[in-house]
Each structure stands twice: as structure tokens, then as C-alpha cells.
């Protein structure tokens, strides 16, 4: 019987079997093909056999006498072959562990085996992915026997195979099954022999059924597309699949062994069930078990450095193993407790599963349970969810209904029109019979409710943590000892922390003591850098000498190095920055221990730009990783986010002045980054519940307001935010002013022409390069006409391209190519080009055209007034080309200025800043919003002018706070230039709605200090005597 006939044999036998509910076996992978482990004695006996390097499964198939090896000679059947039908195909799988492992009972057969001329040998190499993942493979040598070094793993593999056979043949004794395992080399061979000897596997159906018992269900071992295979003409392909399934089975067992080393209290069968729930993804199962172990206070033995890994409580060492098994089954079983079943095309394992407990212990289970287990039976919805779904569909607003998966605005409108839903039957009938709706929305509604439950569980757990922090401070204060960490003595004695900075230092020490990570989110200008340095000094005094890592934007690296050397010269700082060759030398020094350092300072780009950079910070064991301008990690789906998550640090601290920017999901991304072991198992639910767009106050539903309240509850223990108006009473005020600028006559004509042309293109669904960024095209025209090409017509460009041939640098150039290059240039770029080349000098634009902008007319008047008052100006723009045109304006009006943008060398930036702060005759500092809006101190200026606003208002706030920060002595005026009747007015409105979200998140309850919990803030102040 070849493999194809064996499959048919299983299929036909299965159709004849009566249904037996007590047996629902299922191998863990398609096709139970697996290599067998041998004892040391068997391996030694193997060494005496000289044979061809052929798998035993093939030998068994081709041998004339295929009786079970344990059968006595006198009882063996003569000349009967069950594996004779397949024509001379031998399969050698180099990725299998059992290639060279043969039972002694088969050794004589091996010696006599030869290949005829019709034999085809198929050799399968292990894939690169298998080798790169470090999956166990046997060492391969010609005509030699591979050796298994770890005898304990041999026993574990044998136990695993025994467990698989027991599930298939529950009525057979362990001794019978062990004999079969020892007599064959693969799982396929053992199962085939067992089918011939015992007749059938367990006598029960393999079709999945809903368990009626109270015990948690045991997963079936055959999926629909695993149990029955279609007829194949190509037997070689079938052999490949059989060998591949054998390899997959062994990989799974190696993953089980690896996981058991991390969790010795768990049985292997329990770990298999968990891995099945997570589609055999080791990292996901590990994270889930870690969360479960932490919630149940169980033992977890870490074999590697894990972020936030803390010592396990001593009482967990004696945690009963049977209790572990019970708890684990309760956590990962679904079907016996959930009657929610629904038909699906295919059974898919979902890594996100959660059990709805009758009594919820706050914070005991944060994972999600959104996987519905499907069977072929009728749909059943448990009563608990019926009431929740009925109540939700009856009372939810249209906006809330659209949160249901696959529920559009139109469907939500129809649901509201079908109300009221007086009963479950009425709801089901109305949804089924209404055009455009279906009963699937009811099942999807359960998914939404479960997602809400996950968020509520996170809230409860976070509330517990917050209460613990409060209790800790209360206890210390009550005992009279107080919680007061003074300024570390190794800080520069000539400098002192401000009172609110001492509170920040104490808060950082408090969360560190409780094994948490945090986000220091003080408003820009309150000295987050100083508080972070003071915290590192505190750790140094406590005996934690590092190494620590500080990741910063490129524009602030010089400032960080200066501040660390100024505030805490005791800390030895290593700057990981420079070219690839320079960084290579630094890496060599680090690995060779030539460098003596406590802190490494690097940039976001240098930390992850190459595989060598990423490898360094994965291998280097860091104590704290501090990320400045942490809002750069607001997108959990970005490559930067994923790479930085791999940094091997015990603790993480984020510094950001704008934790909330566009939506609440960005804030949740930051929380997931600093506390991955707590939030990573719920990222999909968090993404759905907090990713909706920000709305104005009058458009917010009750649920959206609740969402904000939920987010505030979750972030409470992990974030500290103070605003300047509350902690810096002496800081001068900041005033905002909106200047609506009417466009010039020519500019307005050009803007309307562009608008109509783009609108026509949209209506005609035309695809062209101009439509790639309609918004950007309108923004550029609203700022200045020279950002487009209007004045240099095609005729002018052709004439200019001919004249360019007279230039020594272009005498042999092709005029057509010059013309093509000029076509894509803007008017101002062409104007600059005309200034560079003598023969086209006459084509320069007049100064009147350069200054022909509505914003320039207003800006000229504002600058004249400010100069007369003695004010100094910091002028920001989004576009570097706009800065080029602004330079022409400033020169025209004879204003002294400096300029800093993304092209400015990092080494030069600090000198430009110092020059502006010391030379009071410099009137204007030109900055690009991206490059000059982060970590720069320009308190010598008191007026900020935003020539063009950003789509993200927090980028503009960052720019404003270059002046409005500690050290400012004058009132700060912020002026925003908005072109009237353009897209900029819509941008301004949207930005105001985004800022409203931050106000909602940081709304101060009575007694609060910022968004920090009121009790903790007050207690810390009281304890410190402030």
C-alpha cells in the first residue's frame, strides 16, 4: 500500500465508522509523518550497519516482507507486500531528523536493498528559512549515522509520538504503541503499521463536534483540508508532502520543548494546545503565557533578556502544577464555555482568544478572545451576549454602529430605521429579511462587544496599577519617612532642579521601583532632558551604572551631549554617530570593550539604518533605553517602530511634548512600545477601538466621549504630563494671532485656475502626475505663485535651452534634454538658474513678481513693526524653497537673518543657534518646521511667525515652543499667516479639532496636576514638602 492508497484506506475506513463523541483525535499537522527517536543502544547498533543513505519509510515501503517486526517468524505472512504499488520512487529528505536512524530490526533488509534502473531518487534540501530560524536539524554525513546529543530530547520526542498514537488509538495499551514506535522510524510508518494491526484509529469520527461535556474541549487533530486529500496522479508530489509534514511535526515538537524550558510548570500537552491557539507562532504563545503567568503569579523562567523582565515572586515557586493545568485550560479553552458557533469555509486558528468569565477578576486576563470556533452545526448565541447585542443595536448611534465590522454608514442607517428590537427573535428576523442587511452583522456585533470588553479589562488592570502606586506613596508618607528623592549628588552642584522637575524625578523613580515603564510627556520647554539626566544620575547612585541608551533626533544630538556633560559630568558618554565606517569602528570598540561608557547617545537613523546597527543594539544588554521626541513612535505599523522594538533594554522611557497628536491610537502606540508585555496581546482591539477620526465637540457621541475617558484611565499609571501654565507661574504668557491674508490679484487668478483644473480632472477621473497630490499643489499656490511654473512658458524654455548651448559647461549638451529638465522646474528655480548663467541672465524675473504674494504684503508690514519695537523673530516654513524666496524678501528689506534647515550640517547647527542667541543685531532666524522645530532653544526671540501651517498642529506647537520655554523673559507672540479663501482655512479648522482632542485628554479634574493622577501628584508634593 503506497501513500496514496494509505490515504484512501483512511478515508474509506472513516466513512464506515459510527460517531463516538468521546474520541475526537487530531494530529497537530497535516499528514502525521514524523521521524522517530532512538535510544543510545539502538544508535550504537546502527553504527555496525553499512547501507545506503535512505529513509526508513522508503525501506519499509519497498520491502517484500512488510509484517510488523515484532511478529514471530513462524507467524509472518509469506510474500505479502502492502507497499508494492508505487513504482520505484525513493524519497530522501535531508531536512528530516530520521534519515540515518533505522531500527535494528530492519538492518538486514537494508543490507540487501538495491536500486534497479527504474528507481527515481528524490532529494529534498532543507529550506533557508528552516536553517535561519535555528530549527533543529540532524548533522548529515555520507555513509555515517547522525548522532542526537541530547538524550532528554529523544525521550521527549518518543513521549510526543506516544501521545499522538494514544489519541489515534485510545483503546490500545502504551506497551503496544511503544513497540510500534520502536519498530518504525517515522510517524507515517507507525500509523500505517497500527492501522494494519489494530484495524482503525480509535473507532470514532474525526469530524469536529461541539463537546457536550463540561470539560474544556480537546482540539481535533485533523482539519477539513488535512484529513481527506484529493486523488493525485503525481506520486512524487505526494511523497514530497509526506516528508514535509514529517518535518513540520518535528519542528512543532522542538517548539514545544523550547517553550517548556521557559515554563517548566506546564505540561507539554498544555503547551501544545496554547501553540495551536497561536498557529504555532512561538513568540505569540510566549507573550500570551507570560501575561497568563504574571496574572496568576506563576513561575516564569526567562532564558533570554526580555524587556521589562522582572524577578518572579517567591510564592510562585510553589504554585501547584495541577492548578496551572486547570487555569491554563480555563484560559485557552473556548468551545465548552462558549456556545457561539457559526459556519465558515475554513477553520482558521486565531491567536487572539479570550474566555468570558462569569466573575471577572480585575486585571487577571488582558488577552483577547475574538476567535469564534466553528462547527457544522446550527448557529448558537449564548444568552449573555444576546442581551448585550440587543441593547447595543437598540441604543447605539449611527457612528457607533459603523464600528461593527463590515457595517457601513448606509447599513447603520437601515438598522436605526428597523428599531425597536423587542426580542432576540424580532432582531434576527428583521436583520435577515431586510435588503442590504444580514444576520452576519449580529455575529460581527459580538466581535465589537468583545473588543470593548478587552479595553475594559485593560482599564481595570491599569486602575489596579494606579492604586498600587497611590498606596505606596500613602504608606511611605504615613510612616513619616516620606517619598523624597533629593537631587542626586553627582549632578553639577552649581545647577539645581526646579520643584516640578524634582516631582518628575520622584515619579520616574516610583514607576521604576514598581517595574513599570513610563512616558514623560511634560509640555515642551519644561526640561524633560534635564529630568531624564537626573534620573540616570539617580540610577548611577543606586548602583545601576548602565549601559543606558539615549535615542534622539539628529538635530538635538549636540544639545544632548552638551547637557549631559554640563549636568552630570560623572556619566561617561559614548556618541554612536557618524558615517558607516566611523560607526563600524565604534561597534568594534564596543565589542572589544575598548570603550568605557555609561550612556550611549545615538540618533533614530543611526540606530536602525543598517543590519549591523540593529544587530548591535539587539545584542547589547542595556538597562534603560530613553527615546527623545517619542512621538516619532506614534505608528505601531511603521518599520522604524518595529526595528526599535527589538532593542534589548530592560526598561524604556519615552520623552515627548505631544503624546496626543492626530488620534488616540497614536497614544496607545506609545503605551504599547513602553509596556509591550501588557498591551501587545491586545493591539488589534486597541487599533479598532481608538483609531476613529477626531471630531469637534458638537459632533462627539456619548461613546466617543467615553472612549476618551477610557484612554485617560488606561494611560494614568504610565504617563506624567504637566503644562507650563500650571507649573511655571513665572513663565511669561503666550498669545496666538491669526492673520488672514488676502491673495494678490494675480495670485488669486492663478489659484482659481488651478483649482478648476484639478476639479475638472477629478470629475473626469483623469490620471496624471498632477493629481498625485492635489492638496500640496493648492497649498503651494496659496503660499506663493512662484512655487509653480506660470511665467516661464514653453516658448521661453525652448529659447533658453538653445542659449544654454553657448555656456562652456553645456556647449555639447542636447537642447531637447535641457528643455525637458527645465519643464519640471518651478518659476523660482528657473529664476535662480537665470542668475547663474550669463547667456540667459536676461530672463530673470522682476522683483515685483517675486514679491507678488498676499502673505508677503502682510509679512513686510509685520516685520517693520516688530523691528521698531525691538522684538526678534523666528520665522518657520514647511518648504525649503519658500525659505529661498523669503531670503529674497529679507534682503530686499535689509533685515539681518540666519537660516537653518534639513540641509544644514549637524555640526553647524549648534553654532548657528549660539550665534543667534548671542548676537542681538540678528533680526530673523529662518527655520524649516521639521528641522528647526525639535529640541532647539531660541529664547532670545519673542515672536514666532508661521508662514505656512502644518497639517499636524503639534509640529507647529513644537516650533512655537522654541521660544516659549524655560529661560524666556518676554511675552511670546505667535502669528499664523493664513491665505484667505484657500485650502489653508480648512486645514486650520481641522487642526483646531485635533487640538481639542489634547484638551479633552489633559482636562484637569479638580485637584489634578496636568493629566497626572491627583492623589499621586498631591502625595508626592506633600511627601517632598513642596
Swiss-Prot record:
Isoform 1 is expressed ubiquitously. Isoform 3 is expressed mainly in skin and esophagus. Expressed in fibroblasts and keratinocytes (at protein level). Residues 314-323 have a biased composition (Polar residues). SUPFAM superfamilies: P-loop containing nucleoside triphosphate hydrolases. It catalyses: ATP + H2O = ADP + phosphate + H(+). There is a cross-link at residues 77, 84, 335, 471, 724, 996 (Glycyl lysine isopeptide (Lys-Gly) (interchain with G-Cter in SUMO2)). Residues 157-199, 251-294 form the CUE domain. Residues 7-19, 226-238 have a biased composition (Basic and acidic residues). A motif (DEGD box) lies at residues 1005-1008. The modification N-acetylmethionine is found at residue 1. A motif (Nuclear localization signal) lies at residues 721-738. The modification Phosphothreonine is found at residues 54, 71. Residues 1-82, 203-251, 302-328, 354-373 are annotated as: Disordered. The modification Phosphotyrosine is found at residue 217. Binds to DNA preferentially in the vicinity of transcriptional start sites. Interacts with MSH2 and TRIM28. Part of a complex composed of TRIM28, HDAC1, HDAC2 and EHMT2. Interacts with PCNA. It is linked to Adermatoglyphia: An autosomal dominant condition characterized by the lack of epidermal ridges on the palms and soles, which results in the absence of fingerprints, and is associated with a reduced number of sweat gland openings and reduced sweating of palms and soles. DNA helicase that possesses intrinsic ATP-dependent nucleosome-remodeling activity and is both required for DNA repair and heterochromatin organization. Promotes DNA end resection of double-strand breaks (DSBs) following DNA damage: probably acts by weakening histone DNA interactions in nucleosomes flanking DSBs. Required for the restoration of heterochromatin organization after replication. Acts at replication sites to facilitate the maintenance of heterochromatin by directing H3 and H4 histones deacetylation, H3 'Lys-9' trimethylation (H3K9me3) and restoration of silencing. This is SWI/SNF-related matrix-associated actin-dependent regulator of chromatin subfamily A containing DEAD/H box 1. It comes from Homo sapiens (Human).
Amino acid at each position: 500500500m503506497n501513500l496514496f492508497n494509505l490515504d484512501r484506506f483512511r478515508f474509506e475506513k472513516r466513512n464506515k465508522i459510527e460517531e463516538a463523541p468521546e474520541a475526537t483525535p487530531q494530529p497537530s499537522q497535516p499528514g502525521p509523518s514524523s521521524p522517530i527517536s532512538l535510544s543510545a543502544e539502538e544508535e550504537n547498533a546502527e553504527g555496525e550497519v553499512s547501507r545506503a543513505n535512505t529513509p526508513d519509510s522508503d525501506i519499509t515501503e519497498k520491502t517484500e516482507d512488510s509484517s510488523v517486526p515484532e511478529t514471530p517468524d513462524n507467524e509472518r505472512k509469506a510474500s505479502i507486500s502492502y507497499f508494492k504499488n508505487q513504482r520505484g520512487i525513493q524519497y530522501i529528505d535531508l531536512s528530516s531528523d530520521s534519515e540515518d536512524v533505522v531500527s535494528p530490526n530492519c538492518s538486514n533488509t537494508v543490507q540487501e536493498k538495491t536500486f534497479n534502473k527504474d528507481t527515481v531518487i528524490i532529494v529534498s534540501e532543507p529550506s533557508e528559512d528552516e536553517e535561519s530560524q535555528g530549527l533543529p536539524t540532524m548533522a548529515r554525513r555520507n555513509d555515517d549515522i547522525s548522532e542526537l546529543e541530547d538524550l532528554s530530547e529523544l525521550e521527549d520526542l518518543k513521549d510526543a509520538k506516544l501521545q499522538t498514537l494514544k489519541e489515534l488509538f485510545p483503546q490500545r495499551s502504551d506497551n503496544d504503541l511503544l513497540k510500534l514506535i520502536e519498530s518504525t522510524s517515522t510517524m507515517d510508518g507507525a500509523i500505517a503499521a497500527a492501522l494494519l494491526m489494530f484495524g482503525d484509529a480509535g473507532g470514532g469520527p474525526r469530524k469536529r463536534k461541539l463537546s457536550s461535556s463540561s470539560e474544556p474541549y480537546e482540539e481535533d487533530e485533523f482539519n477539513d483540508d488535512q484529513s481527506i486529500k484529493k486523488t493525485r496522479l503525481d506520486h512524487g508530489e505526494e511523497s514530497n508532502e509526506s516528508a514535509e509534514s514529517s518535518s513540520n511535526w518535528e519542528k512543532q515538537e522542538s517548539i514545544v520543548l523550547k517553550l517548556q524550558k521557559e515554563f517548566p510548570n506546564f505540561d507539554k500537552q498544555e503547551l501544545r494546545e496554547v501553540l495551536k491557539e497561536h498557529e504555532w507562532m512561538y513568540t505569540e504563545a510566549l507573550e500570551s503565557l507570560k501575561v497568563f503567568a504574571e496574572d496568576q503569579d506563576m513561575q516564569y523562567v526567562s532564558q533570554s533578556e526580555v524587556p521589562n523582565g522582572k524577578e518572579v515572586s517567591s510564592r510562585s515557586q510553589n504554585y501547584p502544577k495541577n492548578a496551572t493545568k486547570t487555569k491554563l485550560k480555563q484560559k485557552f479553552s473556548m468551545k465548552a464555555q462558549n456556545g457561539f458557533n457559526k459556519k465558515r469555509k475554513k477553520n482558521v486558528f486565531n491567536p487572539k482568544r479570550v474566555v468570558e468569565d462569569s466573575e471577572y477578576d480585575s486585571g487577571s486576563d488582558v488577552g483577547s478572545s475574538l476567535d469564534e470556533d466553528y462547527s457544522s452545526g446550527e448557529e448558537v448565541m449564548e444568552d449573555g451576549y444576546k442581551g448585550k447585542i440587543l441593547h447595543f443595536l437598540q441604543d447605539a448611534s449611527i457612528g457607533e454602529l459603523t464600528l461593527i465590522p463590515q457595517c457601513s454608514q448606509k447599513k447603520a442607517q437601515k438598522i436605526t430605521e428597523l428599531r425597536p428590537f423587542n426580542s432576540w427573535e424580532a432582531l434576527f428576523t428583521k436583520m435577515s429579511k431586510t435588503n442590504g442587511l444580514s444576520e452576519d452583522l449580529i455575529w460581527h456585533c459580538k466581535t465589537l462587544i468583545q473588543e470593548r470588553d478587552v479595553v475594559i479589562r485593560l482599564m481595570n488592570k491599569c486602575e489596579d496599577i494606579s492604586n498600587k502606586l497611590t498606596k505606596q506613596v500613602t504608606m511611605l508618607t504615613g510612616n513619616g519617612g516620606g517619598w523624597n528623592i533629593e537631587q542626586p549628588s553627582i549632578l553639577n552642584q552649581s545647577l539645581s532642579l526646579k520643584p516640578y522637575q524634582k516631582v518628575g524625578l520622584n515619579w520616574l523613580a516610583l514607576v521604576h521601583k514598581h517595574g513599570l515603564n513610563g512616558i514623560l510627556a511634560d509640555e515642551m520647554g519644561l526640561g524633560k532632558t534635564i529630568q531624564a539626566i537626573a534620573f540616570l544620575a539617580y540610577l548611577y547612585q543606586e548602583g545601576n551604572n548602565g549601559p543606558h541608551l539615549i535615542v534622539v533626533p539628529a538635530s538635538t544630538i549636540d544639545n544632548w551631549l552638551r547637557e549631559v556633560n554640563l549636568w552630570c559630568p560623572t556619566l561617561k558618554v559614548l556618541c554612536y554617530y557618524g558615517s558607516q565606517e566611523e560607526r563600524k569602528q565604534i561597534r568594534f570598540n564596543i565589542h572589544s570593550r575598548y570603550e568605557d561608557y555609561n550612556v550611549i547617545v545615538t540618533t533614530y537613523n543611526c540606530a536602525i539604518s543598517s543590519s549591523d546597527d540593529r544587530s548591535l543594539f539587539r545584542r547589547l544588554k542595556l538597562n534603560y533605553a530613553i527615546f527623545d521626541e517619542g512621538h516619532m513612535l506614534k505608528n505601531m505599523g511603521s518599520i522604524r517602530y518595529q526595528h526599535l522594538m527589538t532593542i534589548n533594554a530592560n526598561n524604556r522611557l519615552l520623552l515627548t511634548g505631544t503624546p496626543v497628536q492626530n488620534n488616540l491610537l497614536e497614544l496607545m502606540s506609545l503605551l504599547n512600545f513602553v509596556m509591550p508585555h501588557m498591551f501587545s496581546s491586545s493591539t488589534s482591539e486597541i487599533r479598532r477601538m481608538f483609531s476613529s477620526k477626531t471630531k469637534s465637540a458638537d459632533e462627539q457621541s456619548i461613546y466617543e466621549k467615553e472612549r476618551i475617558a477610557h484612554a485617560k484611565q488606561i494611560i494614568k499609571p504610565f504617563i506624567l504630563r504637566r503644562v507650563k501654565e500650571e507649573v511655571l507661574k513665572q513663565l511669561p504668557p503666550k498669545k496666538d494671532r491669526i492673520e488672514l491674508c488676502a491673495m494678490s490679484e494675480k495670485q488669486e487668478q492663478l489659484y482659481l485656475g488651478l483649482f478648476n483644473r484639478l476639479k475638472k480632472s477629478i470629475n473626469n477621473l483623469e490620471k496624471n502626475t498632477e493629481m498625485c497630490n492635489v492638496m500640496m499643489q493648492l497649498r503651494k499656490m496659496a503660499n506663493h505663485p512662484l512655487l509653480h511654473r506660470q511665467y516661464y512658458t514653453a516658448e521661453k524654455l525652448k529659447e533658453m535651452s538653445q542659449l544654454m548651448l553657448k555656456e562652456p559647461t553645456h556647449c555639447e549638451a542636447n537642447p531637447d534634454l535641457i528643455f525637458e529638465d527645465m519643464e519640471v522646474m518651478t518659476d523660482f528655480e528657473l529664476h535662480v538658474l537665470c542668475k547663474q548663467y550669463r547667456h540667459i541672465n536676461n530672463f530673470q524675473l522682476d522683483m515685483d513678481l517675486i514679491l507678488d504674494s498676499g502673505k508677503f504684503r502682510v509679512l513686510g508690514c509685520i516685520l517693520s513693526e516688530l523691528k521698531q519695537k525691538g522684538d526678534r523673530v523666528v520665522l518657520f516654513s514647511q518648504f525649503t524653497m519658500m525659505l529661498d524666496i523669503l531670503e529674497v524678501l529679507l534682503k530686499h528689506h535689509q533685515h539681518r537673518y540666519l537660516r537653518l534647515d534639513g540641509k544644514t550640517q549637524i555640526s553647524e547647527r549648534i553654532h548657528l543657534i549660539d550665534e543667534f542667541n548671542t548676537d542681538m543685531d540678528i533680526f530673523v532666524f529662518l527655520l524649516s518646521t521639521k528641522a528647526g522645530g525639535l529640541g532647539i532653544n531660541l529664547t532670545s526671540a519673542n515672536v514666532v511667525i508661521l508662514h505656512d501651517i502644518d497639517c499636524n498642529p503639534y509640529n507647529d506647537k513644537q516650533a512655537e515652543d522654541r521660544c516659549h520655554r524655560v529661560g524666556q523673559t518676554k511675552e511670546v507672540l505667535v502669528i499664523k499667516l493664513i491665505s484667505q479663501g484657500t485650502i489653508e482655512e480648512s486645514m486650520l479648522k481641522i487642526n483646531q479639532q485635533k487640538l481639542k482632542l489634547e484638551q479633552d485628554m489633559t482636562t484637569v479634574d479638580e485637584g489634578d496636576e496636568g493629566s497626572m493622577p491627583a492623589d499621586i501628584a498631591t502625595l508626592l508634593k506633600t511627601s517632598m514638602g513642596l
